[in-house]
């Protein structure tokens, strides 16, 4: 189980990303628009830099919903591989069966 502080930090990042998502997308679009002047694009980059560091979606980490494990997490389920195996064998995940051939 991951430490609670790490999980809380992730939740805080999620909230910041959601809060600044619109601004981040606008500045990003301006900065990457080659039809704009160089000054406008440079200004947009400066504004992007002024946003909080954790407002950038690339700083988010996928974690297991049960254990908080940061690695080996399947996006489709939001669970770590060990928990998927555990729940699948117990029959708690619909549609998952053990492979046999």
Swiss-Prot record:
Tell me, which GO biological process terms does this entry list? translation
Which parts form a coiled-coil structure per UniProt? none
In the UniProt record, the signal sequence range is: none
Keyword DNA damage assigned to the entry: answer is no
The UniProt GO MF terms for this protein read:
rRNA binding; structural constituent of ribosome
InterPro entries according to UniProt: Ribosomal_uS14 (IPR001209), Ribosomal_uS14_bac/plastid (IPR023036)
> Which keywords, in A-to-Z order, does the entry hold?
Ribonucleoprotein, Ribosomal protein, RNA-binding, rRNA-binding
Q: Where are the transmembrane segments?
A: none
An example of a Gene Ontology cellular component annotation for this protein is: cytoplasm
Q: Which family does it belong to?
A: Belongs to the universal ribosomal protein uS14 family.
Q: How does it assemble?
A: Part of the 30S ribosomal subunit. Contacts proteins S3 and S10.
What HAMAP family does the entry give? Ribosomal_uS14_1
Identify this protein by name.
Small ribosomal subunit protein uS14
Q: Which organism is it from?
A: Polaromonas naphthalenivorans (strain CJ2)
